[in-house]
Amino acid sequence: MANVIVIGAQWGDEGKGKITDLLSRSADVVVRSQGGVNAGHTVVVEGQTFKLHLIPSGILYPDTECIIGSGTVIDPSVLLKEMAQLHALNVTTDNLYISQTAHVTMPYHRLLDQASEEKRGKYKIGTTGRGIGPTYADKSERIGIRVIDLINTENLRQKLEWTINYKNVILEKLYNLPPLDAKTVIEEYLEYAEILRPHVVDSSLKIYEAIRKRKNILFEGAQGTLLDLDHGTYPYVTSSNPIAGGACVGSGIGPTVIDRVIGVAKAYTTRVGEGPFPTELEGEIEQLLCDRGAEFGTTTGRRRRCGWFDAVIGRYAVRINGLDCLAITKLDVLDTLEEIKVCVAYQLDGQTCRHLPSSAGEFARCQPIYRTMPGWQQPTSDCRSLEDLPKQALDYLKFLGAIMEVPIAIISLGASRDQTIIVEDPIHGPKRALLDENGSPWDNHEF
C-alpha cells in the first residue's frame, strides 16, 4: 500500500498529467486536491490526446476511482464539457466523484477576474481569466457557493439571488459592466446540479475509507511549487497551494498517511504569464525549446516562456515539498543542442545567492550563474533504458540528481506512455534521508 503525492517542481506545465497517468496504472484512487480550470493536463494514449482541466488523469483507467477534492474550485460548465468529451471517446465517468465541499466558480467570478486583470494595467499578474482567484476569494470571505449548496436546490435560489445582487453592484459601479440576470444564472446552475448530483460525495470520508482498506492512492497536483500562494513567487502565483502540504489540506487527510512525494520537472524551465524568470532565454534557442516542446498552454493556449533548468528553484521545491524522487520530462527537447546550461546559483547585487529570494523585486534582479554541459545531439525519444541514452544525456541527468539531492526515478522522452524510462520504483522506493550535519555539496559550494 502506498499513498503518493505528485507535485510540480517548477512553475507548472511540467508534465504531471503524463506522470500521473503512468502511476495511475497501480493506483486504486486518484485525487485532485486543488486548483480549477486554470490547470491543464495532457495525456497521449495510443495516438489519442486527452486534455483535462478538472478531471484527474486516472479517469482513463475505468477501475480507478477519481476524486475531485474539497480544495478545488469547480466550473460546472467546463466539467460537463470534459465529461462529454470523454464519453465521445468511449471513456466512462462512472468512476468520477466530486467533493460536496468544493467551491463552485460562477459567471461573476470569470467577469470579475477578467475585469480586475484589465484594470491592473502594467501591474497585471497573468491570470487565466477563468475566475479562479475570485472563487477562492469568496471562499475566504465565506460567501462562496459550494457543491453541497449547488445540489440543495431549495437554498441555492436564495443564496444566489443575494450573491448575484451583491456582485452586480461591483460589476456595475467599479468596472462599468452590465449586471448579470440572476434568474438566468440560477436556472443554468440548477441544470448543472441535476447532472452532477450522482457524482457528489463526502470526499474526505471516501479517501479515508480507501486508506483504511490499504488501497493505493495517488494525489495529483495542479500548477507547480513556484505558483503556490504562500511559498511561490508572490504576487505572480495562483490562489491555492499546489505543494505537498496543500494536497493534504485539499483532500481532507492527515500528513502522516503520505508515503512518498514525487516532484515533476522539465529538463529545462518554462513559465506562463508575468513574473521574474532568471534563466529565461531569447532568440534561437528559446524558439527551439518552444517549438520542440510545444510550449503552449493547455488551458489558455498562451505561449510559454522558456529557459534553462534552474536548480535554485528546483532545490527550493525539494525543500518545500520534502521530495523523495524526481520525474524529469521532455529530455528529448534538448536533443539537438550543442551545449546545455544549468543555473546553479544567482548573482544578486554583487553577491552569490544560492536560495530563492522571498522578494519579487530581489528575484527580478537575480542573474543566473551557469554550469555549461555538452549536449548529445542525437535523438532520445526511442530510448527505453538508461543504457540506450547517450553518455552526455546520462551525465546531464546525473548532474541534475546530484545538485537537487534526490534520485531521478522517471525519465520522460515524449508525450506517449511508452516514451518513458523507469529508473527506480517511484512509488515503493526508499524515503529520502535528511542531510547530515556536514551539509551538502550545494551548501559547500561545490557546484
Curated annotation (Swiss-Prot):
Its main location: cytoplasm. Its EC number is 6.3.4.4. SMART domains: Adenylsucc_synt. IMP binds at residues 13-16, 38-41, 128, 142, 223, 238, 302. It catalyses: IMP + L-aspartate + GTP = N(6)-(1,2-dicarboxyethyl)-AMP + GDP + phosphate + 2 H(+). The active site is at 13 (proton acceptor), 41 (proton donor). Substrate binds at residues 298-304. Pathway: Purine metabolism; AMP biosynthesis via de novo pathway; AMP from IMP: step 1/2. GO terms for biological process: 'de novo' AMP biosynthetic process; IMP metabolic process. Its cofactor is Mg(2+). It is an enzyme of class 6 (ligase). Keywords: Cytoplasm, GTP-binding, Ligase, Magnesium, Metal-binding, Nucleotide-binding, Purine biosynthesis. InterPro entries: Adenylosuccin_syn_GTP-bd, Adenylosuccin_syn_Lys_AS, Adenylosuccinate_synth_dom1, Adenylosuccinate_synth_dom2, Adenylosuccinate_synth_dom3, Adenylosuccinate_synthetase, P-loop_NTPase. Binds 1 Mg(2+) ion per subunit. Gene3D superfamilies: Adenylosuccinate Synthetase, subunit A, domain 1, Adenylosuccinate Synthetase, subunit A, domain 2, Adenylosuccinate Synthetase, subunit A, domain 3. One of its GO terms (cellular component) is cytoplasm. Pfam families: Adenylsucc_synt. It is found in: Cytoplasm. HAMAP family: Adenylosucc_synth. Plays an important role in the de novo pathway of purine nucleotide biosynthesis. Catalyzes the first committed step in the biosynthesis of AMP from IMP. Homodimer. This is Adenylosuccinate synthetase.
